[in-house]
Regions:
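Short amphipathic helical patch at the helix-1/turn junction of helix-turn-helix
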Residues: 4-5, 16-17, 45
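N-terminal flexible/basic segments that precede or flank functional cores
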Residues: 1-10, 71-72
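Residues in the helix-turn-helix
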Residues: 24, 35, 50
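Short basic helix-loop element that most often maps to the first helix and adjoining turn
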Residues: 9-27, 53
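Recognition helix of helix-turn-helix/homeodomain-like DNA-binding domains
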Residues: 30-45
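Short loop/turn motifs enriched for small/polar and acidic residues
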Residues: 67-69
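DNA major-groove recognition helix of helix-turn-helix/homeodomain DNA-binding modules
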Residues: 49-64
């Protein structure tokens, strides 16, 4: 469950760092505010395509890393 929590935390932190409400992010991305809420509450799993749209709406890029277990 940790990777899912990390994605949720990163999404919320990024949105807040850009001083955006869920509604404002929804308007910028065309993604319904209810869907953003579900993502942030962990009741919906995002696709990479959806995460990319969210990142672009926050004027950010999406970066995904594979990290060896011993470095965690």
């Amino acid at each position: 469950m940790q990777p899912e929590f990390d994605v949720i935390r990163a999404l919320v932190d990024a949105r807040i760092s850009q001083n955006l409400t869920q509604k404002e992010l929804a308007e910028k991305t065309g993604i319904h505010q209810a869907d953003i809420s579900k993502l942030e509450n962990g009741t919906r799993n995002p696709s990479i395509k959806l995460l990319k749209r969210l990142a672009e709406g926050m004027d950010m890029i999406l970066k995904i890393e594979f990290i060896p277990k011993q470095k965690i």
